[in-house]
Amino acid sequence: MEAPVFNLEGEEVDTVELPSFFEEPVRKDLIRRAVLAAQANRRQPYGTDPRAGFRTSAESWGAGHGVAMVPRVKGRRHPAAGRAARVAQAVGGQKAHAPTPEKDWTQRVNRKERRAALRSALAATAKPEFVKERGHVIDDVPHLPVVVVDELKSLNKAREVREFFKSVGLWADVERAKSNRRIRAGKGKRRGRRYVKPKSVLIVVDEDEGIKLGARNHPGVDVVEAMHLGVEHLAPGAHPGRLTVFTPGALEVLEERLGE
């Protein structure tokens, strides 16, 4: 399977033989398993205060008083006297079955499964039906996957990267990501995650020589070195088919890393 190689002006200058994994079937089940495992392994343990609800001297009255035998606040002639405390059904009591920091959230994925998931996610980037299903705008994209000369990795100015996106038909997808940014629903908006930001173009290079600096300010654009490429880069949210740009050098690294 061959793909055209474009220069920074969007002109076809060469062809490259794509690695065999671009022709593999897309296994959504493996991709989802790998992405969810990666997300679970980043979770930070959390739990309640072990003493929560126990900071009281309340004691049960025992049997024979015609009331429930729950711990009750001591004292007389004040509003809290005799009020239930400590138990889960009482105001200010402990939480029933509270989360504990000892819980292990990690998930393990077999080595061959994880490798197959990455190969499958790469294959989805070459299939227009998966890229469109993710919501990417590819009307002006000449070919999938997009392969661009190695000079791409040295672009360190936002203006240069913007002109490159326009020349190869990727700018429409960047604008889609910019216009679809929205305020997050729920409490996350006040926890440093105010906006939900769509993903747009992923750039995969063999070595960063400035492209991260040039691309970082464009909405939804990510840059990753081929040696560190993961399933989550290619399938955010476990949805395969991200609009991806490869350099020939990156393809060589991936073939060496994932080849048969």
From Swiss-Prot:
Coiled coil: none annotated. The gene is rpl4. SUPFAM superfamilies: Ribosomal protein L4. The lineage of its organism: Archaea, Methanobacteriati, Methanobacteriota, Methanomada group, Methanopyri. One of the primary rRNA binding proteins, this protein initially binds near the 5'-end of the 23S rRNA. It is important during the early stages of 50S assembly. It makes multiple contacts with different domains of the 23S rRNA in the assembled 50S subunit and ribosome. Forms part of the polypeptide exit tunnel. Pfam families: Ribosomal_L4. It comes from the Archaea. Belongs to the universal ribosomal protein uL4 family. This is Large ribosomal subunit protein uL4. It comes from Methanopyrus kandleri (strain AV19 / DSM 6324 / JCM 9639 / NBRC 100938).
